[in-house]
Amino acid sequence: MGKKSKVGKSRRDKFYHLAKETGFRSRSAFKLLQLNRKFQFLQKARALLDLCAAPGGWLQVASKFMPVSSLVIGVDLVPIKPIPNVVTLQEDITTEKCRQALRKELQTWKVDVVLNDGAPNVGASWVHDAYSQANLTLMALKLACEFLCKGGWFITKVFRSRDYQPLLWIFQQFFHKVQATKPQASRNESAEIFVVCQGYQAPDKIDSKFFDPKYAFKEVEVHAKSVSELVSKKKPKAEGYADGDTTLYHRFTLMDFLKAPNPVDFLSKANEITLGDGELENHSSTTEELRQCCKDIRVLGRKELRALLNWRTKLRRFLTKKLKEQAKELDINLSSGEEEEGREEEEKTSPKAAADEMVKEEEEEVELALAEMKAKELAELKRKKKKILKEQRKQRERVELKMDLPGVSIADDGDTSMFSLQTIQRTQLLNEVARGDMASADALLEMRPGDDDICVSDADDEDDVSLASDLDPEELVEIEARQRRLERERREQGVKRVKPKVEEEEEEEEEEENPLLVPLEEKSVLQERQTSLWFGKDAFAGIEDDADEDLELGQSQMLAERQRESQTGKTKKKGQKKKVPQESTAAEPQDAADTGADTAEAEAEQSSDDDSSSDEEGPPTPVGRKRGLVEPCGFEVVPIEDPVKKARVLDAEGLALGSVIATSKKAKRDLIDDSFNRYSFNEEEGELPEWFTEEEKQHRRKQIPLDKQTVEEYRQRWRQINARPIKKVAEAKARKKRRMLKKMEQMKKKAEAVVSTVDISEREKVAQLRRIYKKAGLGKEKRQVTYLVAKKGVGPRVRRPPGVKGQFKVVDSRLKKDVRAQKRKEQKKRRK
């Protein structure tokens, strides 16, 4: 007895196991995943309808890849287990009840994507099953045409049968682009294929015959055409003959051929060319073959016609040369313009130009086809590039949020290369190797600042680039101000010790040494050997003979240093102070270059220069005058500059007086002379009462002769300057304006999104726009109050007078006096 095996066991392929692992309810979910990966229709969809959705694998994929708060509806004959954010209906898609249920769920919305993965119960016969599936697809298309928005997508499953081509033709009537594809998840032995219809046209009227299976799948008998039907019965239109042309045989002379403006047209009309002129007939270019070709032009091919055109060009050049010689003999100047014009005509009428035109037309057609293909490829590449950039941005965000630790990602960052001792340069790296794989992750967490959200140090500037890119301009301004304040506080706390450059170089050399690589010789022996090899060259042969000169130079340098110290001591006695720098010179390479041994060399060089020029320029200037002095303790002392005198602010009369002094020497001299008068030595203002001096100012002071117009101009300038806001007020106004503009842009984007939404009614659009404007603060308008002056005898209640709209307030003279008295009381309180 044979062993019976289960059929379902053989169908459990890799997609079946993947569905089990990932939590999808069916392996067909990977079909939709692969279709979406190719066409990208789920990412932009806001509403989706899945027909024949059980058990819900496609609904799971749709809810995962569609935007948040999207509407997803699934319909099937059998119940579907609940899925988060998905509406499921148990209806038959071929009934009217299903349409009513969908209208109730969608209300005024239109869906962007309609999916159909339905198939009938198979098993009777292949012909019957294929027809049932095509009929089911036609019903799904009917629902899609009712609920799809313009430009929507329709993805359906179709069996390959004789009803496949009629279905494709119907799809092409409703959609701009129809493509048939078979995803990898679909089994090879299955007859199913998926048709992706893109760009729903949304016609105003649809003929019901499109959705009638009897009409749509009706077999059309193609009658065999007879031979008489294949032959065209239409006669060609008679073009006729030229006016006055009574013969069909045209004979022309050679001169007519040479004078013809268009030689190609001339050859198409001519039957024979007669060679009447003996000189042209006996020309060297006139061969026997050309003579025979001229006798019957209608039988010539392209090669012979081209030879005739080249022959014509040579004869025309010969005639042009002959005419020039005759003109010289008769002292007639032949215009070069006619010759150039003739050459242009020859170039235009050459057979090469006619052949090039045909080639150009073919090339243009090929170029157009290539351009279309390139445009499609570029669009596809842009789409893929955009997707890759989006994934990279998400990965950066995960790393910044510390969601991914280094070493966890699969990408090869160079850590998987072969181990080498050369790569370990410091003891810290050695400790990390000893700790294991997670040492780099711990080091990264230790390096991250935990106390402050914003890192001010220069070493972490690169880490803060991504943070700064996500902040608003206002927040960036606040961060920069905070950074400057922190740097100022750090400078005021104390002075950092300056390390000499030589010590820094020694430390760098010690850090660069590899702790795991041991040299064969000691360091001192190796340095001495390298030094002896370097100074053993011929260029340093006479350097020992100059030892006496080096001694003299050293003594002169010491003398110059003593003179400089005495100069600095004198300046200290005069009261010049030294100032400690706010910032460490180690942060600036230029200042660091002046410290340590390099400073001594620079001072020695400058002292020698000062000695050489001391006779001409006087005593040498101290080195620390501009750059500051570097003392042996390592601190840089900078002298304090003289305080800048505060400029005197002149009033309008003072500015007018200054303009008179600057423009005229005579007026300046007169003003100086007039300044000596009996009011020059008045008593000081502090000795007399204030009220007395204020009263006597206008009588005990001589008026300066100034132009009133000039004084008024300067007063107007002062008014304009005083009208300007201070810097803080201007910055505050600018920030407020920038916030308002930003809020306006956000509001405009939201309003445009609401207006462009097709799925809501106009009433809902207006309500949403009002809410947006109200939230932005644009709907609040300041009420205008109308003031009415009350007459005597008016009671407390006043009726609205005619012609006054809106809010009004009744005022009288008593109220005006009360307000004035209240203001006076407030001023007295302020004075106290």
Swiss-Prot record:
<feature type="compositionally biased region" description="Acidic residues">
    <location>
        <begin position="503"/>
        <end position="514"/>
    </location>
</feature>
<dbReference type="InterPro" id="IPR029063">
    <property type="entry name" value="SAM-dependent_MTases_sf"/>
</dbReference>
<feature type="compositionally biased region" description="Basic residues">
    <location>
        <begin position="822"/>
        <end position="832"/>
    </location>
</feature>
<feature type="binding site">
    <location>
        <position position="117"/>
    </location>
    <ligand>
        <name>S-adenosyl-L-methionine</name>
    </ligand>
</feature>
<dbReference type="Pfam" id="PF01728">
    <property type="entry name" value="FtsJ"/>
</dbReference>
<keyword id="KW-0949">S-adenosyl-L-methionine</keyword>
<feature type="binding site">
    <location>
        <position position="58"/>
    </location>
    <ligand>
        <name>S-adenosyl-L-methionine</name>
    </ligand>
</feature>
<keyword id="KW-0808">Transferase</keyword>
<keyword id="KW-0489">Methyltransferase</keyword>
<feature type="active site" description="Proton acceptor">
    <location>
        <position position="157"/>
    </location>
</feature>
<feature type="region of interest" description="Disordered">
    <location>
        <begin position="795"/>
        <end position="832"/>
    </location>
</feature>
<dbReference type="GO" id="GO:0000463">
    <property type="term" value="P:maturation of LSU-rRNA from tricistronic rRNA transcript (SSU-rRNA, 5.8S rRNA, LSU-rRNA)"/>
</dbReference>
<feature type="compositionally biased region" description="Basic and acidic residues">
    <location>
        <begin position="811"/>
        <end position="821"/>
    </location>
</feature>
<dbReference type="GO" id="GO:0062105">
    <property type="term" value="F:RNA 2'-O-methyltransferase activity"/>
</dbReference>
<dbReference type="GO" id="GO:0016435">
    <property type="term" value="F:rRNA (guanine) methyltransferase activity"/>
</dbReference>
<dbReference type="GO" id="GO:0030688">
    <property type="term" value="C:preribosome, small subunit precursor"/>
</dbReference>
<dbReference type="InterPro" id="IPR028589">
    <property type="entry name" value="SPB1-like"/>
</dbReference>
<keyword id="KW-0539">Nucleus</keyword>
<feature type="coiled-coil region">
    <location>
        <begin position="726"/>
        <end position="758"/>
    </location>
</feature>
<dbReference type="InterPro" id="IPR024576">
    <property type="entry name" value="rRNA_MeTfrase_Spb1_DUF3381"/>
</dbReference>
<comment type="subunit">
    <text>Interacts with NIP7.</text>
</comment>
<comment type="function">
    <text>RNA 2'-O-methyltransferase involved in the processing of the 34S pre-rRNA to 18S rRNA and in 40S ribosomal subunit formation.</text>
</comment>
<feature type="region of interest" description="Disordered">
    <location>
        <begin position="485"/>
        <end position="523"/>
    </location>
</feature>
<dbReference type="InterPro" id="IPR002877">
    <property type="entry name" value="RNA_MeTrfase_FtsJ_dom"/>
</dbReference>
<dbReference type="GO" id="GO:0030687">
    <property type="term" value="C:preribosome, large subunit precursor"/>
</dbReference>
<dbReference type="GO" id="GO:0001510">
    <property type="term" value="P:RNA methylation"/>
</dbReference>
<keyword id="KW-0175">Coiled coil</keyword>
<keyword id="KW-0690">Ribosome biogenesis</keyword>
<dbReference type="InterPro" id="IPR012920">
    <property type="entry name" value="rRNA_MeTfrase_SPB1-like_C"/>
</dbReference>
<dbReference type="InterPro" id="IPR050082">
    <property type="entry name" value="RNA_methyltr_RlmE"/>
</dbReference>
<feature type="binding site">
    <location>
        <position position="92"/>
    </location>
    <ligand>
        <name>S-adenosyl-L-methionine</name>
    </ligand>
</feature>
<feature type="region of interest" description="Disordered">
    <location>
        <begin position="546"/>
        <end position="631"/>
    </location>
</feature>
<feature type="binding site">
    <location>
        <position position="76"/>
    </location>
    <ligand>
        <name>S-adenosyl-L-methionine</name>
    </ligand>
</feature>
<comment type="similarity">
    <text>Belongs to the class I-like SAM-binding methyltransferase superfamily. RNA methyltransferase RlmE family. SPB1 subfamily.</text>
</comment>
<keyword id="KW-0698">rRNA processing</keyword>
<feature type="region of interest" description="Disordered">
    <location>
        <begin position="332"/>
        <end position="358"/>
    </location>
</feature>
<dbReference type="GO" id="GO:0008650">
    <property type="term" value="F:rRNA (uridine-2'-O-)-methyltransferase activity"/>
</dbReference>
<dbReference type="GO" id="GO:0005730">
    <property type="term" value="C:nucleolus"/>
</dbReference>
<dbReference type="Pfam" id="PF07780">
    <property type="entry name" value="Spb1_C"/>
</dbReference>
<dbReference type="InterPro" id="IPR015507">
    <property type="entry name" value="rRNA-MeTfrase_E"/>
</dbReference>
<dbReference type="GO" id="GO:0000466">
    <property type="term" value="P:maturation of 5.8S rRNA from tricistronic rRNA transcript (SSU-rRNA, 5.8S rRNA, LSU-rRNA)"/>
</dbReference>
<feature type="compositionally biased region" description="Basic residues">
    <location>
        <begin position="570"/>
        <end position="579"/>
    </location>
</feature>
